[in-house]
C-alpha cells in the first residue's frame, strides 16, 4: 500500500511539473488595447477598432467602419504550407499576375516571417493602385487548426496603429 502511495505521489509530481513546463512555452493571449474589440473564431483572434462591423460570408469576413475606407478581410482555406517559403520573387511569379488581372497594379512588395504571440506568420506588404485609388495592403498569413488564414489590412488612408495593433494581437493559442 505504501509503495502504491509513493508511486501515485511521484506520478502526480511528474504530471504537475509537465503542466508547469508546458505552460511556460505557451504564448499568452495578448491584451486588447483600448478602442479595439476582439475578432475571434475557433483557431484565431486579433483586435480591430471598436465601432467597426464584421460581416462573415462562406470563406471571408469583412471588417470595416460604416462607409468606404480602411478595412480588414479574413479569408480562410484548407491548411496549406504553400506560403511558408513565400518570397518577393515567388509572389511576383505566382500571385502578382492575379492582382494585375483584376486591374490592380502592385509595387513595393515585401515578405517577412514574424512570430507574434507564438504564431508563425508570413507578412506580405505592398502598395497598390486600383481604379485610380492608392492603397497600402498588409497581409498576415497564419496556419492554425485545420485552416490557413490570410488577414489583410487595406489602407486607403495611412493608419500605422491599425496595422500594428492587428499584428501585435494575432493569437492562435500556440
What residue ranges belong to the model's regions?
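Bacterial N-terminal signal peptides that target proteins for export
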Residues: 1-10
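C-terminal motif of bacterial Sec signal peptides marking the signal peptidase cleavage site
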Residues: 19-23
Amino acid at each position: 500500500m505504501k509503495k502504491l502511495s509513493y508511486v501515485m505521489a511521484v506520478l502526480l509530481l511528474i504530471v504537475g511539473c509537465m503542466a508547469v513546463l508546458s505552460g511556460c512555452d505557451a504564448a499568452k493571449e495578448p491584451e486588447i488595447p483600448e478602442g479595439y474589440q476582439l475578432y475571434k473564431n475557433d483557431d484565431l483572434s486579433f483586435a480591430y477598432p471598436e465601432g467597426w462591423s464584421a460581416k462573415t460570408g462562406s470563406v471571408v469576413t469583412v471588417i470595416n467602419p460604416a462607409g468606404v475606407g480602411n478595412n480588414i478581410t479574413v479569408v480562410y482555406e484548407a491548411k496549406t504550407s504553400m506560403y511558408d517559403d513565400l518570397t518577393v520573387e515567388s509572389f511576383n511569379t505566382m500571385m502578382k499576375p492575379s492582382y494585375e488581372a483584376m486591374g490592380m497594379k502592385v509595387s513595393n512588395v515585401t515578405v517577412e516571417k514574424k512570430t507574434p504571440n507564438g504564431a508563425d506568420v508570413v507578412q506580405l506588404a505592398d502598395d497598390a493602385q486600383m481604379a485610380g485609388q492608392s492603397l497600402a495592403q498588409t497581409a498576415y498569413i497564419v496556419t492554425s487548426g485545420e485552416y490557413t488564414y490570410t488577414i489583410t489590412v487595406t489602407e486607403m488612408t495611412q493608419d500605422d496603429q491599425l496595422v500594428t495593433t492587428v499584428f501585435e494581437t494575432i493569437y492562435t493559442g500556440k
